[in-house]
């Protein structure tokens, strides 16, 4: 358990994961299994074995496992048996065991696996027989036919063992003892669930006489031509070798290793993430044929530019963990393919394999579908940060061999993939000589691909400058030529060196819960400063594990839900895709902001800007439509020329008839002209919109409050009042309106680990801001979640005027809400003035009014922004139109309930009952031209706040409508920058103007 080395025994040298016709036997399926509470043979493992069972007896062929359970391979044992085999545990930074490397706790769950496999007679003539494990967490010991074969380490790294001479024709026994904790656990602290077991495939391989041990076909591109450089590991009896690339007419025979030479290809289509052209190739020897797919591309750094095939790359990437709510990290190809197809549909062009090599088939898919890949080594020691990096293995000579072994296995397995454009040494492992040694090894082995590692702040051993969660001011200073501001952890000289390199954000716009906000600020910097090459969102998908309450209610579990003593809560729920595969509103925002084709719509035409790396717009058409008050009046397809990558054109519009009096919008969509491997024909890449005509006048009904008749009989239009308080709207019993300043805090509202911008300037602290409490903490301190009202005045002489003061116990700051009700024909008009008193010293989450409706209200139709939610710093995906949604689709079911569902700038809202229109609410602009937004939900903000999971929300007894004059922005402060000052909601007076009419 305490061995810091990479493993021992009959370990074979790492090599490529190849598609070959050599014989192989999969060992996936049911294995005999038992779970022990500790590791036999260790001081803490005394007594864990049955009486009279020897420590290593499990490996004996005569051992009786008939009473054991069955365990599927691949799988994690803690995800099987409904807790019978232990439970998952989640931590982000902290270790779930004492930090005393290389020691681990006595309580070390250990799984024993046994199965038999029948080996064909003809394998007796194989040159070698190999047992291959693609992934086992964390340390494991292997026996075959009673013979100890070796020890493996490196949970997400392939390991092969030579079992030649041990395996025999007929039935063979394979035994694996897997320990959850080992010294390796200290270097695998990767912000994910700790999930032990054999979770990737196991194979028995027959290596044929005259076979190909390894091959690396380096295929580069320049000036329209390609070049293939072959590196082949094979014995003399494997020759002659024949390389065939049918698509290029190549058939080359090498009679010996000495004859292997580069092949020049005079004309070839290059590979890129946008045009992933692959050429099928085979390399055949006397005993084996290996199949590969070649992608011709050249990666280089020229000054501070990162180039592929001579063109600057902008990474619109995501960090991708391997996670599934039922299988954990066990691979499923159909799910993985859909995962990557969804990425393409949402304009993701790059993947960082956080924080380990993925299943090798994922990289085949990345080659095929087209992604720039940062392939990361299986390495993270983040837990040492909590002890000031004392004892960090990254600078400990005792760990050097293990570090080098990990990077060798990473590079060697995946070196043939054209999608990989950067090797990453790992993540959040501090810095030290072992990391520098890893980098030196990579540079020697693969001089073309650059080396990445974010923790190398000073740039001593890496080729690109990388940061995570740098603020907008910091990022701007990194991109600015001649800036003298010191960079994080750098001297002036080191800062200058880092500014001479390409810069990328290996993690940014943290996507936890509702957010992230202000993605466009980063994208604007990438447009302005060529040194900035984009980044990778943290992260792609929530890691929720499917669980059920004792009553059988399904939910997605996060840290602490399995009784962990040490955990990091719902920090594992920080993806742009929810655990069930639902894209979040933040992902739609991202898609629009990073769109590879940008549309700027004007009254006289459309500017089509092709921001792609190399692909033209030949695969697109540009569909336009004109909508008056949200209803289509004309549509067509632009007569647009093909736009080359990096170019822009202005396309004139056909003559458009715009009638006065309504609100008329022109919308243009860039859509796929034909189906692809990842989307159907008509899929929308990006959208542009322009206001052609605004309403000519302020609605006449807004003047009704000036000449309201007396309130007689308790009625004004569709409103009915009781004792000076609203009781019914269009026959619907209601409660309200009341002032609402509270929203259920988002994960970003709760964030305090990064500086705050409410009390400090974002440019303070070298552009990183200054420490501050979370926004949610300040809101609670201000009592915004517990406001109570006191009616100050009720006047029914002209309509109904009602003034209420809202404030919290033990606090003097308040909010005055004046309601002025009047009648307009058969409709009711409401003007609400919201005026803060003195004494407020914080931003507000929202400023609006809440009206509780009957639970029979089940949806909404609206004219305004949509179809998804929007907030002040998350508006780019919103467009103006007419939309419809059922109640449950108006909010987002985040794993931890929080604010969601706000639709800004609503003009008209119709609430539905049993799917039919019931109450129409029109909104008018205030004196500053601002429209309110709305949220319609099943629960109050206070009820949502109190729930840790969706199933903890109380049974709904109402529909809760909040009309907001304003909302606070989202930011990404759960792990990143606070809400930018422009999008903060400071206490201020606002007016809301509404008209209510019976509908249907």
Identify the meaning behind each predicted range:
Residues 75-119, 123-133, 137-143, 150, ...:
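Active-site-adjacent substrate/metal-binding segments within catalytic domains
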Residues 180, 272, 654-662, 674-676, ...:
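Beta-strand/loop-rich accessory regions of lumenal/periplasmic or secreted enzymes
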Residues 23-28, 32-43, 72-73, 78-80, ...:
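Substrate-binding clefts and catalytic carboxylate motifs of secreted carbohydrate-active enzymes
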Residues 340-343, 350-576:
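Substrate-binding/catalytic cleft of secreted carbohydrate-active enzymes
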Residues 1-92, 177, 523, 530, ...:
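Accessory carbohydrate-binding/adhesion or oligomerization-edge regions at the termini
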Residues 2-19, 32-38, 54, 68, ...:
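Accessory beta-strand-rich segments of carbohydrate-active enzymes
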Residues 16, 79, 84-87, 92-103, ...:
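An acidic-aromatic loop/edge-strand motif
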Residues 142-144, 225-254, 261, 281, ...:
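Beta-strand-rich binding/interaction modules
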């Amino acid at each position: 358990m305490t061995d810091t080395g990479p493993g021992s025994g009959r370990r074979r040298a790492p090599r490529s994961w190849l598609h070959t016709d050599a014989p192989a036997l999969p060992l996936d399926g049911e294995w005999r299994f038992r779970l022990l509470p500790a590791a036999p043979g260790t001081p803490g493992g005394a007594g864990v074995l049955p009486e009279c069972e020897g420590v290593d007896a499990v490996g004996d062929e005569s051992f009786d496992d008939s009473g054991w359970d069955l365990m599927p391979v691949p799988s994690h044992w803690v995800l099987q048996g409904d807790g019978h085999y232990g439970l998952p545990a989640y931590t982000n930074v902290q270790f779930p065991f004492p930090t005393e490397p290389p020691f681990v706790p006595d309580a070390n769950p250990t799984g024993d696996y046994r199965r038999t496999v029948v080996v064909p007679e003809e394998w007796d003539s194989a040159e070698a027989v190999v047992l291959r494990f693609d992934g086992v967490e964390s340390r494991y010991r292997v026996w075959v036919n009673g013979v100890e074969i070796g020890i493996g380490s490196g949970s997400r790294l392939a390991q092969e063992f030579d079992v030649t001479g041990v395996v025999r024709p007929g039935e063979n026994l394979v035994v694996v003892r897997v320990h959850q904790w080992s010294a390796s656990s200290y270097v695998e602290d990767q912000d994910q669930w700790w999930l032990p077991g054999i979770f990737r495939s196991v194979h028995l391989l027959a290596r044929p006489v005259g076979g190909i041990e390894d091959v690396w076909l380096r295929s580069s591109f320049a000036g329209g031509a390609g070049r293939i450089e072959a590196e082949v590991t094979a014995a003399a009896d494997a020759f002659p070798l024949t390389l065939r690339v049918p698509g290029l007419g190549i058939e080359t025979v090498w009679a010996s290793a000495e004859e292997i030479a580069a092949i020049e290809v005079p004309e070839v289509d290059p590979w890129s993430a946008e045009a992933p052209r692959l050429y099928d190739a085979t390399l055949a020897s006397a005993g084996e044929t290996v199949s590969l797919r070649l992608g011709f591309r050249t990666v280089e750094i020229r000054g501070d530019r990162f180039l592929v095939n001579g063109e600057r790359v902008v990474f619109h990437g995501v960090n991708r963990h391997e996670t599934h709510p039922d299988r954990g990290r066990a691979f499923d190809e159909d799910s993985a393919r859909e995962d990557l197809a969804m990425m393409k549909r949402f304009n993701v062009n790059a993947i960082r394999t956080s924080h380990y090599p993925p299943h090798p088939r994922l990289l085949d898919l990345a080659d095929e579908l087209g992604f720039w890949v940062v392939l990361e080594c299986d390495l993270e020691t983040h837990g040492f940060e909590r002890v000031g990096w004392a004892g960090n293995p990254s600078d400990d000579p005792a760990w050097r061999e293990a570090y080098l072994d990990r990077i060798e296995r990473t590079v060697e397995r995946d070196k043939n993939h054209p999608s990989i454009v950067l090797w990453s040494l790992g993540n959040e492992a501090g810095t030290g000589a072992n990391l520098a040694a890893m980098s030196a090894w990579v540079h020697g082995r693969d001089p073309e691909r650059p080396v990445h590692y974010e923790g190398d702040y000073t740039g001593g051993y890496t080729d690109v400058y990388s940061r995570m969660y740098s603020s907008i001011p910091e990022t701007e200073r990194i991109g600015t030529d001649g800036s003298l501001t010191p960079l994080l952890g750098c001297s002036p000289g080191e800062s200058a060196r880092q500014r001479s390199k390409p810069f990328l954000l290996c993690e940014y716009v943290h996507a936890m819960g509702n957010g992230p906000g202000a993605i466009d600020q980063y994208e604007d910097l990438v447009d302005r400063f060529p040194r900035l090459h984009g980044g990778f969102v943290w992260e792609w998908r929530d890691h929720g594990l499917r669980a059920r309450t004792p009553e059988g209610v399904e939910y997605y579990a996060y840290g602490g839900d399995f009784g962990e003593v040490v955990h990091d809560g719902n920090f594992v729920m920080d993806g742009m895709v929810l655990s069930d595969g639902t894209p979040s509103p933040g992902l739609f925002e991202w898609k629009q902001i990073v769109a590879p084709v940008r549309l700027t719509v004007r009254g006289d035409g459309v500017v089509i800007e092709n921001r792609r790396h190399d692909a033209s717009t030949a695969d697109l058409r540009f569909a336009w439509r004109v909508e008056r008050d949200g209803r289509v009046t004309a549509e067509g397809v632009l007569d647009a020329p093909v736009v080359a990558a990096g170019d822009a054109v202005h396309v004139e519009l056909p003559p458009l008839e715009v009638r006065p009096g309504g609100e008329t919008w022109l919308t243009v969509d860039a859509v796929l002209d034909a189906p692809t491997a990842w989307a159907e024909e008509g899929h929308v890449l990006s959208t542009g919109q322009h206001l052609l005509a605004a309403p000519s006048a302020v609605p006449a009904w807004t003047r009704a409050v000036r000449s309201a008749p007396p309130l007689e009989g308790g009625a004004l239009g569709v409103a009915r009042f009781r004792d000076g308080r609203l009781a019914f709207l269009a026959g619907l019993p209601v409660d309200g309106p009341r002032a609402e300043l509270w929203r259920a805090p988002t994960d970003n509202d709760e964030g305090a680990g990064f500086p705050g911008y409410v009390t400090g300037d974002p440019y303070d602290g070298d552009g990183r801001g200054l420490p501050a409490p979370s926004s949610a903490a300040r809101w609670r301190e201000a009592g915004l979640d517990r406001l109570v009202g006191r009616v100050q005045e009720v006047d029914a002489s002209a309509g109904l005027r009602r003034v209420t003061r809202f404030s919290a116990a033990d606090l003097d700051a308040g909010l005055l809400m004046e309601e002025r009700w009047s009648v307009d024909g058969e409709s009711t008009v409401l003007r609400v003035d919201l005026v803060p008193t003195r004494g407020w010293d914080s931003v507000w989450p929202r400023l609006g009014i809440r009206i509780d409706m009957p639970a029979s209200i089940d949806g909404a139709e609206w004219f305004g922004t949509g179809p998804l939610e929007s907030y002040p710093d998350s508006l780019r995906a919103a467009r103006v139109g007419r939309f419809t949604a059922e109640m449950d689709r108006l909010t987002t079911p985040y794993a931890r309930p929080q604010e969601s569902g706000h639709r800004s700038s609503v003009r008209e809202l119709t609430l539905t009952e049993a799917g039919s229109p019931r109450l129409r609410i029109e909104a008018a602009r205030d004196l500053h031209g601002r429209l309110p937004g709305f949220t319609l939900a099943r629960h109050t903000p206070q009820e949502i706040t109190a729930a840790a999971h969706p199933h903890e929300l109380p049974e709904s007894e109402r529909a809760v409508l909040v009309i907001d004059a304003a909302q606070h922005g989202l930011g990404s402060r759960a792990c990143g920058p606070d809400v930018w000052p422009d999008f903060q909601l400071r206490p201020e007076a606002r007016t809301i103007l509404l008209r209510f009419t019976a509908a249907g």
